[in-house]
Amino acid sequence: DKGDSGNIGELSSENFKVEVGGESVFVYQARVSKYPINQNWPGYQRPLEQTEIASFASFDYEAGKTVRITTEQKIESCDIRPKEFGIIPEVKGNTIEFVVTNPCQFVVEVNGHHKALHLFVNPKEQIQVDKEDSRIHYYGPGVHEAGVINVKSDETVYIDEGAIVYGVIRSENTSNIKVIGKGIL
């Protein structure tokens, strides 16, 4: 699988398989709210019965590459949101195909909005940072239990491709901070 370095310690989706240009892309599963309205209560976490498993994948944009999504379920409807992107899926059996024309983020809803697939199509870029710089909070490939990451003015959090960071970024009364990289927070 393309993206194997990013799946350390994470479960793959049971609902979707994704290929881009004929190459497999790792599809993660994540627990999300099953309700369209969320509450903004600091410290509040939904009870487990108010959540469901969604899927997501991330890959670099390459012009002209076909995205192929396969699911075990019979596809009765398929919507790609936001609709403004104009991505028109072609459905054949249990497979969905389309071409993405630029880097973007969107959701593929099969048979309704529950258990959706979130796709993150990244610009192809190489980020250069000095990992030894004291102003860089660097997280390399692998799983990191970071807890609270306190960021001061003029500092950068760099989450490298293949990194999975469990934590929260905290920054108060600061300026010129950046959170960059292709990893997962």
Where are these regions (language model features)?
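An acidic-aromatic substrate-binding cleft motif
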Residues: 123-141, 145, 149
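Extracellular beta-strand-rich solenoid/capping regions of secreted or surface-exposed proteins
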Residues: 98-100, 144-155, 164-180
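A residue-level signal for beta-strand positions that form part of recognition/binding surfaces
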Residues: 105, 136, 176
